[in-house]
Amino acid sequence: MDAPRRSSRLAAKIANVLDSKGTIIPEAAPVMLKKPAKDESVDSTIQVGDVIPDITLPDEDGTSIRLRDITANKGLVIFAYPKASTPGCTKQGCGFRDNYPKIQASDYEVLGLSFDTSKAQKAFKDKQNFPYHLLSDPKGELIKKLGAEKPGGGKLFRSHWIFEKGTGKCIVKEIDISPLVSVDKAFAVITDSEP
């Protein structure tokens, strides 16, 4: 009895094998599996309610700062700026500087973040007398996880995030925001006041 006719496309996908008696047996056609659906829970950017990434980055002096060590004991505001020592970034940084005593009184810490090197961060901090640390993230490890990297890479949206004391959960995520609005909104959340 003849084998059932198969299309040439399918026949090309079937390999022949020999059984123990040397008889040719067609091997079953490979099973075509659908690509698994993208798991939305594996989104690479942090969302409100997510825990702060367990990342350690150098500050302006090259000292390693582990984010979860801070949020274990204090709330945390991270503000991201495109480039150290530029006008908008200076406004944003100085706004957090000027409100820093009140932010600390509310049991929060502040960190600045950009792609800049530790050396550039040091010059920026010293020139503006910032009382908080500036994180250097030239590879964008944290910037990407926070969702602030612009399409094409290497640049970021001015942004800020607020993380809860103890749990490290993100309670505010503001991406692509103006310098002064960033400060006002973050300060309002921290101090439970109107922006």
Curated annotation (Swiss-Prot):
InterPro entries: AhpC/TSA, Peroxiredoxin_BCP/PrxQ, Thioredoxin-like_sf, Thioredoxin_domain. The active site is a conserved redox-active cysteine residue, the peroxidatic cysteine (C(P)), which makes the nucleophilic attack on the peroxide substrate. The peroxide oxidizes the C(P)-SH to cysteine sulfenic acid (C(P)-SOH), which then reacts with another cysteine residue, the resolving cysteine (C(R)), to form a disulfide bridge. The disulfide is subsequently reduced by an appropriate electron donor to complete the catalytic cycle. In this atypical 2-Cys peroxiredoxin, C(R) is present in the same subunit to form an intramolecular disulfide. It comes from the Eukaryota. The active site is at residue 89. GO terms for biological process: cell redox homeostasis; cellular detoxification of hydrogen peroxide; cellular response to oxidative stress; hydrogen peroxide catabolic process. GO terms for molecular function: thioredoxin peroxidase activity. Thiol-specific peroxidase that catalyzes the reduction of hydrogen peroxide and organic hydroperoxides to water and alcohols, respectively. Plays a role in cell protection against oxidative stress by detoxifying peroxides and as sensor of hydrogen peroxide-mediated signaling events. Acts as a scavenger of H(2)O(2). Monomer. This is Peroxiredoxin bcp1.
